[in-house]
Amino acid sequence: MQLNYDYFTKPECKILLPKVQTNPRYKNFTQLYYTVGDEEQFWVETTLKPFLEKDGDASPQSQQRVASQENVWRNLETFVPWQGYENISAAEVEPTFQYMFNRFKKGIYVSIAGGRLQSFVPFSKANFTNDWADRIQIDPKYGSFLNFLKAQHDLNNKWNGTTYKWNPNKVCPDPRYWYANNCIVRYENPISESHSNVAQIKSMLLELVEKRHISDVKFFINRRDFPLLTRDGTEAYDNIFGDETPVPEQYRHRKWLPILSMCTSERFADIAIPTHEDWSRVKSDEGIYFPPVCRNYTFQFVHTWSDKVAKAVFRGSNTGCGWNETNNVRLKLARLGTVRPDLLDAGITNWNLRVRVSKHSPYLQIPDPGTLTAVDRLSPHQQSQYKFIVHVEGHVSAFRLSLELGMKSCILLVQSLHGWKMWYSDLLKPWVHYVPVRPDLSDLFDRIEWCRANDAQCRAMAENAYQFYRTHLDKESILDHLQHTLNRLARQFTAQEPPTDPLLLQMEWERQALAQLAPQKTSALTGQFPPSPFRNWGSLCGFEKFVTQALDPRMEMGSVAVPGKTIFKSKTTKVTLYQLGGTWFVAKRTINLMKKLEFLHEGFIGKMVLNNLVKWCPNYLYTFHYRDEPFISYTWKDYNSLEGGSRVFNPTVKESTVMQEFIDGPTLQAFLQTCTFKSYFEVLFSLCCALLLGQSLCGFVHHDLKPWNVVVQVLPEPTVVEYTVRPDPNSGEKFLTWKIKTRYIPVMIDYGKSHVVYRNVHYGVADQFATNWSLDLQTLLVSTLNEWMLRYHQSEGKENPSPDYGDLVYTANFLSTRPLKTVRDLAGWTLANKKFQTQAPLDFKIFPSNAPVIEDFLKHMAPLTKKYKISFGKGAATAAGWSFNPRQIVDLAFSLDPDQQANAWVQVPRRIYRNPLPAATNKLVATFIAQQLWNGLVVPKLGFVDWAQSENLNRSVAESIWNEYDKMEKFLTQHYWSKIDKMTPAPLTIEPYPDAFQTLVQLRLKPTRSLFLSSDKLQRLRRNIAPQYDAPAFPDYDQYRGMILDMVKDSGPFKLTPDLAAFYLDNLKPLFDEKIMEAVTNLETIKFYTQPTTKSKF
C-alpha cells in the first residue's frame, strides 16, 4: 500500500502527512512507498509477482523515445569497467541482495524490462542486526553504552541550544542493533524507517523509461551516500573494519548485480549516478517537490560578478568522519573563518553530534566543537553574493556541488582526501571550472588571495562552471547519463535465458502433484461421516477421502460444507470452522500471493508426507485437501485490511484454501498463561520427540515453531505416547523409543514455511534445500521462555515469584553461550533473541548440522524430569495403536441405508477373498505384508462390534459378518505363518545399494538456490554429474524407514522376533545413516532440478 502522492506540485507539501502503515507486517514501516522488510517479501516482489504477471500486457508507451545515438554522454565513460559486472545474469540478484540487506540494511532493487519499470522495490531489513558490534568500544570512563549515549544527548542539547529531555527508552544501548553509514552510527529506538530519497529516485526512473530507450537491465540502488562494494573484496566500512579486512566468506562472489550509488571512488565498484538532489533540483523548476523534505531548489542567481563580495564563503554542518578540528575539515574550515574573516566567511550552522566511529580511535567519539559557535544560515541565493564559494566534502562527496556550479561564483574545491567522485566529477577540470584547494586547507588563504589578485581568471572559471551546469547538469543530461550507463550495463548480461527460480519450479510441481490426487468424479453427500471415539490415523485418512469426494472443485465450498465460526483473522489469512457430514474441520483461506504459495506447499507436504507421520505421532496435523476457489466470494471485511486498502490485496484474485483437521484446544501461547511448570515441560518433551521422529523419517523442519503455531489438546485422563525414532544398537529392543505419560498433546500447525524430504528430494520454502536440526528447538525454547518471562513480569508485585523459575534459567543454558544465572539474565536473553531475524549468533551455542541436538537437550533436562516426577524416558516399543481402515470408513460414510452400511463392513474380508494375496520371497517383506493385512482386518472387526450394537443390527446378520471376519483372520494367520516360518532371513537388497553409496558420499554436492539460479553453474554441474543421470534413481527410502517403524511397533501375531529385527536392522543400516541419506537427497535434488527436461516425480 502507498499513499496517493509520489510528489507534490505545491511547496506546501511539507504539511504534516499522516503516518500510514504501508507494510502490513511491520508497524513502524510508514514509508511513502511499500518497503519490504524481510527476505520473503523481497522474493514476492522481485520474483513471484513478475512471474505471475509475465503474460500481462506491457504498459502503453506515451511518446517516441530518444535513442542512444542522440545521447550527449555517448562517447564518454560513465563508469570504470569491472570484471565483477561482466557476463552477469539474474542469478546475481539474490547474493547481491543478501549482501546489501544483511550488512547495510537498506537499498532499492530495480528491474527494467520491455521499456517499462517492471520492479521498483525499496527494502529495509526490519529486524536488523550488524556483524560489527564486537568492534565497538567506549571510553571506560562512561561505564556503559547507556551512559555514553546520555552524554551525547546532553552535549547535543548544550551545543544546539535545545532542552530535549533524556529518555533512555528512545535509544538502544545494545550496539548489535545499530546500523552505520561508515563512520556515522544510528542507535535510536525504534530504528527510524524513513523514505528519504525514494520518491526522487522512482520519479527519475519513471521519466527515464518514458523518454529514453532503455534495454532490459537489473540493478540495485544504494540508498546511503557511502558506497558499499569494494573492488578488492575488502570491507566497505573502513572506519569500522580497517583498510584490509576481507568481507566474510559468504559474501565473496565472483559476479554481482551492479550497485548504483550517488558517490564512488577508485576503491569501489559502485557506479555513480545522478543524485536525488540533482533530480529534486531540476524538477523543482517544473513546480514538482518531493516528500518528506519538499525542498525548493528554484533560485534566481542574478548577482553580477562586479556586485559580488570578494570573499570566500562556506555554510554547512560539521558532517564528516572527524570529531574535532584536527581531523574534521569542516570544523577546521570554520576555525579558519575566525582567523581571517577578511578573506573567509565560514561557519557551522548546526552541530551534527551523531556518534562517530573511526579507525583512528579505539573508542566511539562524540564530535567536539571546541570554542566554535554556530553561525547564521545563508541561503543559496545569499551565498551567491560572494565571488568565491568554498566546497568541502563531508564523509563523502557533498551533493550540493551541482547547485553551486550554477551560482555564477568561482568554486574553491577542496580536493577529496579519499578520492570521492560523483557522476560528473571526471568532467570537471581544475583551473577551468574551479580552483583546487589542498585536502588539509593548508593553501586556502593563498588561494583566496590569488583569486582576489586574478579576478578575470576567476570570473572566467565561474562562467565555465555555469555553462557546465547548463549543459551537463540539466534534466536532459541526467536522463542521457542514466540511459548511457544502464545500456552499457545491459550489454554485460548474458544472452542466455535465466533459469526459473527453484521455488517457482517447486510451486508448479506441487500444484501438479495435488491436481493428480483429485478424484475423477465427486459423490453427492448422503449422510454423516462415522464419528471416531478418538483421534487416529485411519479415521483421519477416511475423512480425507470423504472430503475430496464430497467437494466438487467447480462449486463454492460453502455449498456443501456448513460454515461455522471464524476462529482467526489477520491481514492475510482467515481461518474458519466448517462442518461436513457432521464432522468439524478447519479451512484456512488467503488471497495474499505469498500465503497462497505457502498454503499450496502446506497442502502438498501435508498430503504427501506429514499425514503419514500422524500414524506414528499425534503431534502433527492432518491435511485433508487443498483447492483454489472457483469464485470470488470474499469481501473486504473478511480480512483485517488496512485503512485505505492494502497492497496485500488484489480484488481480482481468488482465494486459496487448505483444509485440515480441527484440534479443539488452546494455543500453546494461551496454555502458557496458566500452566504449571510440569505441564510445560511435558509439552516441551513431547514436541522434542515429535521433531526427532519427523527429522528421522522425512527431514522435517517446521521453520516457525512459535507458541501460536502449536495447539494443545487436553485429554480427560493421562495416556502414554510412544516415539520410536531410530535404530539404537545399545538398546535391547534395537530401536530408540521415548515414552511420556501425559494429558497434554501439543499439535504443530501452520506448515507453510516447513521443509521435508519427499522421494529423496528437498521441498521447502523458508530454507528450500537445507535441514537444520537445531533450528526448531532453538525457536521453540526462546519463544516459549519469552512467554514465561512475560508472565513473570505480569505477576511481579502481585505474588511471590516461584523459585521454580530458576528451572527455566537452567533450560535456557542449554542454548546460551554465556551462563545465565538469574531470571533477570533470562529475561534479557529472551528479549534480545525472541525474533529469529535478530537472534545474535554470539548468544547461541553452535551445533554441527547433523548433531543429535534434541537428544542432547533431553539428556540435559533429565534432572527436571525427576524433580517434577514426569513419566518420561526411554522404553520398549509396544503396540502401534488403534488405526481404522480408511476404505471401510469412506464406504460407510457414503452408505444410504443400514443395508449398505452393513455391506461396508463385510466388504473388508471379502476384498481380501477377491484379490490375490501378495507374496514375497524375502522374510522381512513377507512379514510386513502379513502385518498390514492382519491389522487392516482386525481393527475393522473390532469396530464392527461397536457399530452393530449402536445400530441394533439383526443378530443373525451381525453373526454372519463376524464369522466372515473370523474366518479370514484365521486364514491369514495360517497362510502367512506357514510361509514365513519356512523362510530363512536373507538380506533385503534395495537398489542401487550398497556400492553406490560410497561413490555418492564422495561427491559432496549440496543444492543451493544460487546453484540453480545460474546458467553457467548449471551447465558445469550437469557436466560433472552427467553419469548420474543415466544411473538408476534411488528408491524412496522414506517408505522403507516407515515400513521398518511399522514393523517394530507391531505387537500382533506377526511381531518381529528380536533376532529377526537385529538381522534386518544391521542389513538396512544405511537407511538410517544420516550422512548417506543426506548425500542421496542432495544428489537426487540436484538431478531433479538440473535435468534438461525435468519431469515431475509424482
UniProtKB/Swiss-Prot annotation:
Transmembrane annotation, as ranges: none
InterPro entries (UniProt xref): CAP10 (IPR006598), Kinase-like_dom_sf (IPR011009), O-Glucosyltr/Glycosyltrsf_90 (IPR051091)
SMART domains in alphabetical order: CAP10
Pfam families: Glyco_transf_90
UniProt protein name: Uncharacterized protein 035R
Biological source species: Invertebrate iridescent virus 3 (IIV-3)
